[in-house]
Design a protein with these regions (language model features):
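N-terminal Rossmann-like dinucleotide-binding module
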Residues: 1-56
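Beta-loop-alpha module in the N-terminal Rossmann-like domain of NAD(P)-dependent dehydrogenases
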Residues: 44-47, 56-102
């Protein structure tokens, strides 16, 4: 089965919801088209990012969202920041050839 490396930007409520959704994907899509591997989560500070990584099951945390966009192993950039911060991140992710997911509330 194909695996997809996920980088999630933002670590608030929607990040938690998306993280739970990645974990539950095989329960809703059977057979699942692939498995999400939660690689990196970004938040405003290193401390917050590392805490979010531990709480939400990501391998690592970073305070720089560009670390996710620039990582050649990341397949999907999931944007869970406030809406007014989506554009710059989405454009950078698209230019890097990433698949883009986002939370819109």
């Amino acid at each position: 089965m194909k695996t997809y490396q996920v980088g999630l930007i933002g670590a608030g409520f929607m990040a938690k919801a998306h993280s739970i959704a990645y974990d539950g994907m095989p329960m809703f899509f059977w057979p699942a088209p692939g498995m999400a591997v939660k690689k990196t989560i970004a938040d405003l500070t290193e401390e917050c990012a590392k805490d979010a990584a531990q709480r939400l099951g990501f391998r690592q945390g970073t305070a720089n969202w560009r670390d996710i966009v620039d990582d050649p192993e990341i397949d999907i950039v999931d944007i869970c920041t406030p809406n007014n911060a989506h554009c710059e991140i989405a454009v950078a992710a698209a230019e890097a050839g990433k698949q883009i997911g986002r939370a819109h509330v």
